[in-house]
Amino acid sequence: MRFLIDTANVEEIREIHEWGVLAGVTTNPSLVAKEGRDFVETLKEILDIVDGPISAEVISTDAKGMIEEGEKLAALSKNIVIKLPMTAEGLKATKYFAKRKIRTNVTLVFSANQALLAARAGASFVSPFLGRLDDIGQDGMQLIEDIAEIFSVHGIDTEIIAASVRHPVHVTEAARRGSHFATIPAKVFKQLIAHPLTDSGLEKFLADWASMQK
């Protein structure tokens, strides 16, 4: 499983990119609004940092508007992936872009049927939302497993991006159950790298070394 960062904050992207683990970036209108910056200028800056898929979401709700927005975004770089909602209009736009070999990420997926529809419309990626399913008492991890199994059985190339990741267990389980990517907030990346035994072990090594120098 590969790692994406879920943010529109350029400094967070730059920081995690320096670790050498980032395959790409996902953004959405909420994340962009939080930063209070021009969307296109932000994307250009992200493209300069990360050489990988950058999911940029449209805000139109009709296929025509999604296509118009998506074409402008796709013109920025071959690394731009058009992020579309899991709706009938979103599927129409997905089909349009698939025919033109422009990659798409169908988002707000909450069922295996939705994922299968998106894949058959030509989606490059589907993004099932784990945390939001947990919030309503449903099993987001089982959804990842179901989608992975269905795609495998039917030879579907669409890749799974585990989204709405809230904590490290989501990451471990998504990897274990067949997700191709997890898109993770910077805060959770920092939780992934931390472990108290790592910290205490490092402190002991340094203390032992210091005692040798006396």
From Swiss-Prot:
Group of enzyme by EC: transferase
Record key words, sorted: Cytoplasm, Pentose shunt, Schiff base, Transferase
Major localization listed first in the record, in broad terms: cytoplasm
A biological-process GO annotation: carbohydrate metabolic process
Chemical reaction(s) catalysed: D-sedoheptulose 7-phosphate + D-glyceraldehyde 3-phosphate = D-erythrose 4-phosphate + beta-D-fructose 6-phosphate
Entry GO CC: cytoplasm
Residue ranges that the Swiss-Prot or TrEMBL entry lists as coiled coil: none
Disulfide bonds: none
Entry-linked HAMAP family: Transaldolase_3b
Family: Belongs to the transaldolase family. Type 3B subfamily.
UniProt-recorded name of the protein: Probable transaldolase
Source organism: Brevibacillus brevis (strain 47 / JCM 6285 / NBRC 100599)
Primary gene name: tal
